[in-house]
Amino acid sequence: MKLIESNDTVVFPEGVTFTVKNRIVHVTGPRGTIRKDFRHLHMEMERIGKSTLRVRKWFGVRKELAAIRTVCSHIKNMIKGVTVGFRYKMRSVYAHFPINVTLQDGNRTVEIRNFLGEKIVRRVPLPEGVIATISTAQKDEIVVEGNDVQFVSQAAARIQQSTAVKEKDIRKFLDGIYVSEKTTIVPTD
């Protein structure tokens, strides 16, 4: 069944501005600017007034209508990113061989050494706009921060996947670097 018209709106808070042109959305806030390209989805995106964006689909089937809510969720994540940012805290877990984590290239590359006693050095490059720091308050903790939740979570996933245990029983060998907490950079009430 096709609905004639389906839409959803996103209201932007005070201090956050946006522009829409050819389904490319730019959101600007106190922490910076994020740009997302939605040209692969066939739907209308139009500005209503100063602070509202309407996403509309005409004669859509079920999957196309689901994409409306997905686009609105992405835009809300962009708003959250330019206002409060995203922070993922990761902890190294090891049983015998301590995992050594260092940062290279101005906190743009994470180097992992001595994983399961191996001599190989694992290097994980971070996406643009994402920085990593080693926590001084907590032992064996890496903090990954940025404005775009997709890039921050992708960086955390790459770090976690680089320490995947191969050819051993994963119930016994639990060593690795895992996400322990997902928060925002600016504390919210």
Swiss-Prot record:
Q: Does the keyword Ribonucleoprotein apply?
A: yes
GO molecular function annotations of the record = rRNA binding; structural constituent of ribosome
CC per GO annotation: cytosolic large ribosomal subunit
Whether Membrane counts among this entry's keywords is: no
Pfam families according to UniProt: Ribosomal_L6
Query: Any idea which UniProt keywords this protein has?
Result: Ribonucleoprotein, Ribosomal protein
InterPro entries listed in its UniProt record: Ribosomal_uL6-like, Ribosomal_uL6-like_a/b-dom_sf, Ribosomal_uL6_a/b-dom, Ribosomal_uL6_CS2
Hey, what's the signal peptide range on this chain?
A: none
One GO process term, biological-process aspect: determination of adult lifespan
Indicate the family of this protein.
Belongs to the universal ribosomal protein uL6 family.
Task: Supply the name of the protein.
Answer: Large ribosomal subunit protein uL6
